[in-house]
Every structure is written in structure tokens, then in C-alpha cells.
Amino acid sequence: MQFPESWLRTFVDPQLTTDELSHALTMAGLEVESLSKAAPPTSKIVVGRVLEVVKHPDADKLNVCQVDAGTGATLNIVCGAPNVAPGIKVPVALVGAELPPAEEGGKPFAIKLSKLRGVESQGMLCSARELKLSEDHSGLLVLPEDTPVGQDIRETLNLDDTIFEIKLTPNKADCLSVFGIARETAAITGAPLTPVDIRPVRVELDETLPVRIAAPDLCGRFSGRVIRGVNAHAKTPQWMVERLARSGQRSVSALVDISNYVMFELGRPSHVFDLDKIHGGIEVRWGKRGESLKLLNGNTVELDETVGVISDGRQVESLAGIMGGDSTAVTLDTTNIYLEAAFWWPDSIRGRARKYNFSTDAAHRFERGVDYATTVEHVERITQLILEICGGKAGPVDDQSVNLPQRAPVKMRVSRANRIIGVQIGADEIASIFTRLGLPFEREDDAFLVTPPSHRFDIEIEEDLIEEVARIYGFEKIPARPPVATSEMRATNETRRSIHDIRHALAARDYAETVNFSFVDAEWEQDFAGNDHPIRLLNPIASQLSVMRTTLFGSLISVLRHNLNRRADRVRLFEAGRVFLTDAASKAGELTVEGYVQPKRVGALAYGPALDEQWGAETRPVDFFDVKGDLEALLAPAAARFVKAEHPALHPGRSARIEVDGRAVGWIGELHPRLMQKYELPHAPVMFEVDADALIARALPAPTDVSKFPPVRRDIAVVVDQAVEVQALFDEMKKALAEEACRFVQKVVLFDEFRAKSNTSGGLAAHEKSLAFRVTLQDAAGTLQDEVVDQAIQTLVERMARAGARLRG
């Protein structure tokens, strides 16, 4: 937001210097990014009147002018400007004057006594470009007739005016105008605010244009009026051109300039149609697929049902709230106009200009929210200026309100405001702050009920009001207090590890941590979780980040691809992050949202060689059992069961559900071949994802005696059908450990598997396999006897027989 200080001070004039005013605005949340002068430094440039103009004797394009510059003597100045004429007043650079450099960083241009084609020139008549006021170099800068001769041009044109450039946060749409900034300045400084003098013009026509609002969800209010007999050739007043230029807007024509001027003045974009180019009445509606519109910027856009339009009886005439159409644009031949000012719902405008790869001042304002209560006043203000500058006769204002925002009062507790701000602010002082801000309120014990004004779209919840109190009270008045807390020792819970312990454990096993967004592509949810109905974001930062994740697998695969694209050949990653699930049983709380749960999970991925390239081991690809071993070490001392099961993201024959104490806690397996092909991975990574709670919880360490007696090891080889899972045999042996005969069994591990290559190989049928287990037994009280060991082994064999196993002969 850019504007000249002089314009601001016509509305509010606090007794502050420019720098003090800048500081006050910045400390109230309106950050002043820069202060600059309206024009570069100049000297000895004054107002002069051209008394006489004669042709140069030796140059057809030059004139010799007699000029009164208030010096007491008539100056002889040679000039080549096409608009030089007797009687006009123009800037005159006297001998010794310095003009701004022609190029950035150059030296000032000094005016010297000189001769042009043999005629002495005692100065120079200046254009706006030579003074660096604009790029207009078509002729001399003609000054108003009442300008005093001899006056310094810096005083005449207020060239020492300061340009403020303010960086507004998106919620401060009420400050996207000079009057909006003035309103804030008055609240901050306490200086009186002078509103714009808007008076209804005299209605001389009994004519309105038929208007139909077909989409109340697009347009809540539409005000317009017919004006006939305007002079489109009228010259925009210099004061208006100056204010527009210093607000960053070039002058176009009187009608367009007036519309732009009121937008910068009051914050409401409007549009001026050429009335004679409108066919019948106009309709405000949503666009239709297949329609197109040529815009004022020359672009032609294809419309659809997501874009609002203004159309007449034949075609679309304007992109609602964004830009007008070329077919009804005003030109120098325009004599009759239709003036429009409307309230467009912010949601109906937001993102539409970006959809067509451009932006406009109108869209920037409407998508943030523009005052819906002042459309008629703004039509009157624009009409007032048009009649003053361009003439004409105005019809009545046609004002249609169909769907305006219903602003519910917002409650703010004084006690909560003081607690959040950190300083005691009395209720009377808060009432004064709300009054200065123009916020109507009612007192209710320790609280204020504030009804947001029509121009404040940023006030919706209690914290918004607390922010307003803090801003106007003054952040600088809030003392800096370091936090104070009691220092106490906390008991360490040995039954739980911290998530940091888990992260360090994974890092110690050669996994690198990665941190990803919690919002992902909807396609990932379908691929990696089989989720057709993900939790969608209302306002995603990007289309490919539009849903909340329910699994970490997609994020890990994305990071893997990123690394592979940079020629990494061995990748081991992990992430400890939250996933987001729907749960009707979840109630709203301080850290919970009703209907949703946010459990933390730990996911990891291994790809490429199992070990870094080295001389001590052969290079082999990482496999399921490598990652399974890492996970078992992570879960220890808890023992996990790995149950064959299918997951949408994992290989159907190489995946398992992870169970701890009979509860499913996660998944492990190779990436599904379909996804490996889709995401262009040369090899399948092995991944796991586990509930963080299962890793954090652990049993208390129990002390045991170190046996002085040697352990006994026995091997058991059994034959089972190939369809029988090893886990089923382990489950049966685990049950046997509770029996008296197996009380000395310390450990059972699988150390060999053999599958027949033919019907007679190894005495096994083609559908069978041989499994060998090593059983470790030990007694802390004495040496184990053979009969005790034999009985334990026999019990284990009998248990495995229940799963279809027999001893191998």
C-alpha cells in the first residue's frame, strides 16, 4: 500500500513528524517498509509565465520565448516543446539550477548560460519527465493559472511530500485505502478524523438500468446509476494526477482516473461501463463453461462455473470483482456511462485472478473483504467527482441488497486479555480503545460484547479483539518480563522412553531423519493407504498438498525419490511425525479436535545395499529381514509378532502386520510392485510404520542372577507344509514355555530353512520345507540333566506338532 503523506494528513493530522508517524504505524502493526520523497532533489527551479513565443531564426523546431520567472528581468529561453504558448505557466530552471540525473546513479544536470543555434538561452523550460515526476515528455508541464510566478517549484508541486509504503498483513483489508490508514492513525494517535465529505448529487434523470442478481452467493449487494452527457475528453485535475502517481497509479483518462482515485481514497473498487454498449439490462451470475471474455488488458479468458461475471442480454461484459471487459470499456467517444459499486463475497473472488495468471487491485481488495455497507456512498462520491470534472446528468442510485454478512457479536473477557497481553489494562481503558477504533460494544460484567463493523472482516474471535487492544495500547508499553517458573526435579518414568530416544536409536542404526509436511497429495493417500475419503484442507497452500496424511509411507517414498534423483545409491530414512485420522468418538479438548485423532507414528525405509561398500563383506541388497531386525532391536525388550497380512502399499507376499502383546501396532514389508513402477524406482525399498506409543512403552528392567553353570543347546529339525508360517511354530513354542517341563528354556531361534528342489530331495515332498531351531536351556541352580533337557525338547516338538510339524528323520 503506497500513498503520499500529504493525502493522509487531509484526513488526520497528528502532531507528529514524518519519522514519528512512521514509527507509530509500524508499532501498531502497519509496517512502514520505506519512506521516500515525491521527487529527487532539485534547486533553482521556479514558476514562470511565458510572455511571448517567436520562431527561432535558424531552427524550425525551436522557439525563442520571453519568460517572466519573478527575477525582475525577462528571460530569453530557447525551447523545443510543442505545447509552448504565450500565457502558460511552467517550471523554469534558472541558470545555476540542478535537475535530477537522466539515469539512475548519474550526476545532476546543471543549467548553464548557453547558445542554441546562435541564440542565447538563459535557462530551460521543464517537462514532468525532466523533473522525474512522471515519464510524460510530450510537452512542458503546464501549471494551474493561479500559481504564483517566482515560487519555488518544490513548494508549488509539494515535491518534498513523503511517500509511505506500508506492508499490510492479509487480514488488514480495512487499511487498503488512504482513509483506512487515516482511521487507524486516528485510533493510534488520538488525533481527530475528518471523514470524506460525501453528499448526494442532484438527480436530473429518471432512468435506471435493469439489474438482476442471479447469484446471491457471489454478489451480496449491487449499487449503480446512469450518468448521461459526460465529457470523456475532460482533463484530469493536476491534484488528482499527482495523488494517483504518488500512490503508484498512472493517469489514463478522467473517467478511469476518478474510479481509481476513489478506490485509493476509500478502498472500494468500482467499474465504469459505456452505457451505449450494454445490450438491455445486466445480470450478475456465475459463468458458464464455454463462455469467453476479452478483458481490458487485452487477454481473452475462458470462463467456467467457478468464476463470477456481469453479463448483458448478449454476452459477458465483466469478470466480477476482478476486471472489466473490453466490449463495454469507456473511451474518449463515451458520452453515457453506467457506474457500478458492489459487495462481492470474498470466497467468490479469492484465487480467481491467479487462476488466469494475473492480479488486479480490485481482486486484491475484494478477496480480502470490502465494506458492504457503503456501496451507495461510494457511488455518490464517484458521481460527485465525475459531475465536477466531466459534467453530465445523473439518474437515481439503484441499490439492491440480497445477501449481506450477518456479524455476530464477539465476546472478549478483560481477564483473558490481561493474561494474554501480560499487563493489567483496565476495562475503562479498553472501552476507550474500542471507541477510538470505532468498534461498537456493550459491557457485560468482566466482558465486552463487540459487534464487528462492516469494514472489519478480521474480527471473528476473542483473540482478534485482544490483538486490537494490544495494538492500540502499544506494544512498546508492555514490559519485557522473563518467564518465571519453579525449578523442580521430576521423577523419571522408566516404563517410557521419549520420542527423542527413539530418534537417536534409529540414527544409531544408520537411518537419517527427515521432516515432511503433514499435508500431502490426495493421490498419495489412495496409493499408500487405500484412502478414498481423506481429510481435505479448506485452503491448501498448493493443489498437491490438499489433504492430511494417514500414513508416513508417501512422505518417505517422496524423499527417497528426491535422493535417487541426486544419484544416491544407498538410502536409509526415518520420520517421527503425526498422522490424521477421523474418529467420531474423539471429543474437542485443549489439544484435540472433535471428530479427529492425531497419533504419532514412526516410519522408516531402507533402499539399496544392506551395508556401505567395503572389503569385509559382499555387497547385497537390503531385504525384509534386515529391516525386521532393526525394528526388533527398536522394540526390545518387547517381543513382536509378525503376522502375514496385506497392505495397499506393500508387496502382497512380502508384508506383515506387527503385533505387540496381541495388539496391532504397525506394518512392515517391501513396496508394492505396482507402486515401484508408478514412482519409477529401480528396486523395491523395505519400509515399516509403527505407532510411536508401542516404541515408547517398555517393561521395567528385572534383575536376574548370572548362572555359574553352562547352558545346554539342542537343535530341532522339523518338516512342515510350505504354507505353514514360521510364526505359527513360534506361537506354539511360546505357549509351551509356560509349562513346567520348559521352565529352563531361555531362547529359541530359527537358524536354517531348507526347501526341496525335487520330489526326492532331502526326503521332503515338493510342497514341504524343513526348519531348524536352536534351543538354549540353562539352570541358575545347577547343571541340567539329560532327562530334563529331553523332556523340554519333547514338549516343544509336541507343541509344534499341533501346527502340522513333524520331526525330520
From Swiss-Prot:
ATP-binding among keywords: yes
Domain (FDX-ACB) ranges: 707-808
GO molecular function, a single term: ATP binding
GO process terms (BP): phenylalanyl-tRNA aminoacylation
Domain tRNA-binding: residue ranges: 39-154
Pfam families hit by this protein: B3_4, B5, FDX-ACB, tRNA_bind, tRNA_synthFbeta
E.C. no: 6.1.1.20
Cofactor: record remark: Binds 2 magnesium ions per tetramer.
Cited InterPro entries: aa-tRNA-synth_II/BPL/LPL, B3/B4_tRNA-bd, DNA-bd_dom_put_sf, Fdx_antiC-bd, Fdx_antiC-bd_sf, NA-bd_OB-fold, Phe-tRNA-ligase_IIc_bsu, Phe-tRNA-ligase_IIc_bsu_bact
Top-rank EC class of the record's enzyme: ligase
Subcellular compartments: Cytoplasm
Keywords from the named record: Aminoacyl-tRNA synthetase, ATP-binding, Cytoplasm, Ligase, Magnesium, Metal-binding, Nucleotide-binding, Protein biosynthesis, RNA-binding, tRNA-binding
Cofactor(s) for this UniProt protein: Mg(2+)
Top-level division of the source organism's lineage: Bacteria
PROSITE patterns, A to Z: B5, FDX_ACB, TRBD
Disulfide-bond pairs as recorded: none
GO CC term (a single one): phenylalanine-tRNA ligase complex
Record field: catalytic activity: tRNA(Phe) + L-phenylalanine + ATP = L-phenylalanyl-tRNA(Phe) + AMP + diphosphate + H(+)
The keyword Methyltransferase is annotated on this UniProt entry: no
Domain B5: 405-480
Recorded family membership: Belongs to the phenylalanyl-tRNA synthetase beta subunit family. Type 1 subfamily.
Subunit record text: Tetramer of two alpha and two beta subunits.
PANTHER family (alphabetical): PHENYLALANINE--TRNA LIGASE BETA SUBUNIT, PHENYLALANYL-TRNA SYNTHETASE BETA CHAIN AND LEUCINE-RICH REPEAT-CONTAINING PROTEIN 47
Designated name of the protein: Phenylalanine--tRNA ligase beta subunit
Species annotation: Burkholderia lata (strain ATCC 17760 / DSM 23089 / LMG 22485 / NCIMB 9086 / R18194 / 383)
